Amino acid sequence: MLFPIVIGRIYNLEIIFVRHGESEANVLELMYGSSDYLLTSRGKSQAKKAGEILRGMNYEPIAIYVSSLTRTHETLTHMGYAVEEAKKDQRLDERHLGDLEGLDYRVLHKEQPHLFKEWNENWLEYKPGGGETHVAFQMRIRSFLKDLEKNHTKEDRVLVVCHGGTMKTIFAEIFQHHENYFFNLEVYNCSLMRFKQGQKGLVLDALYNIDDWCTGEEESWTSKS
């Protein structure tokens, strides 16, 4: 059983998961997962603010994990951490959407609604051409979580920078109610999820939406009072 969630009073191991900042593909509303896109200026500002939040918590990770994709590397850099010191793990990559990668979501939904109907009716096993099923995606995330549990002690602080779908799957895996939690959790750009080890398992300690901490234009965000 992975990471049972309980209410506990003694906290030791801490893990913070962060989604990458806004990417070019997010702005264009493209279907993408494994494709590599850069951060926008807004995404860089979001990452900078996420880093400030962690430093405000005096959060000093002894281990950092990051996916293999550029947008997470950029996010980590703008958060103030060295990518070279992070452990790059492809299991954290977003789901591979195969032939759907790079297509305009709005156009696709209008011109080929049957694709979304098929996807919704069999969402776990639906496989875009050349892509992967959600089950395959879920299994590699589960593998990462098992290794994370095995490789870290109760005294460790860990930072993981990854993707929206990855974080939703992690959340659902930890809570062991996959479908309900996957579809009912919104993970915005640079959202932070913090888990702490309680007496019997991991406790969801905090969930931050970075936009709630910022105001103003992309290049001049300030903390809200």
Pin down the residues of each PLM region.
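Short, basic/glycine-rich phosphate-binding loops at helix/coil junctions
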Residues: 27-30, 115-126
